[in-house]
Amino acid sequence: MLFFIDTANIDEIKEAYELGVLAGVTTNPSLVAKEADVSFHDRLREITEVVSGSVSAEVISLNAEEMIEEGKELAKIAPNITVKIPMTSEGLKAVKALSDLNIKTNVTLIFSANQALLAARAGATYVSPFLGRLDDIGHNGLELISEIRQIFDIHDIDTQIIAASIRHAQHVTEAALRGAHIGTMPLKVIHQLAKHPLTDKGIEQFLADWNK
């Protein structure tokens, strides 16, 4: 499973990149709104200068024609821009049109296997099921990952699964076990993955023994 960071903060992206594990970035309007010091397009340019992998940039339009035009403009920013489209009927039309233009798409706000299958058949490069938000309403977000992966494997679908709305390290482990191709997460979760109390204890013991 590859690691993406879910943020529009350039300092966080650089910090994750320096760890040597970052394969891409996902952003959304809420994350971009926190970055008041720079325009959306300028921030995307900054990100693509740091990260050579996929950088998802979300449209804010709700009808297909406007999504398509917005997606075309976003794709001009850099060759590694992936246009993020919400999972709606209008969104599916936009995904089909952009896919026909060889523009990569990431269909977001996926909450069912049927939605993921529709998005894949429309030509989505990625689908993003939201784990944490499903957990919040008492549903099993991780089981959804399993369902989508099984369907994609049975039908030989190349669309990649991005496990999104990751809240903690266990989400990452379980998503990887269930076949998600990618996990996108906040910087704090990436740091959580690197930590274990026994690792810290072992380092302390090694240093104590060395200094005796």
Swiss-Prot record:
Pfam families (UniProt xref): TAL_FSA
Gene3D superfamilies, per the entry: Aldolase class I
EC number: 2.2.1.2
Catalytic activity: D-sedoheptulose 7-phosphate + D-glyceraldehyde 3-phosphate = D-erythrose 4-phosphate + beta-D-fructose 6-phosphate
Source organism, top-level taxon: Bacteria
A GO term for molecular function: aldehyde-lyase activity
GO biological process, alphabetically ordered: carbohydrate metabolic process; pentose-phosphate shunt
Cell compartment(s), UniProt: Cytoplasm
Pathway stated in the Swiss-Prot or TrEMBL entry: Carbohydrate degradation; pentose phosphate pathway; D-glyceraldehyde 3-phosphate and beta-D-fructose 6-phosphate from D-ribose 5-phosphate and D-xylulose 5-phosphate (non-oxidative stage): step 2/3
Active site feature: K84 (schiff-base intermediate with substrate)
Cellular component, GO, one term: cytoplasm
Keywords: Cytoplasm, Pentose shunt, Schiff base, Transferase
Chief location bin: cytoplasm
Family the entry assigns: Belongs to the transaldolase family. Type 3B subfamily.
Task of the protein: Transaldolase is important for the balance of metabolites in the pentose-phosphate pathway.
Protein's name in the database: Probable transaldolase
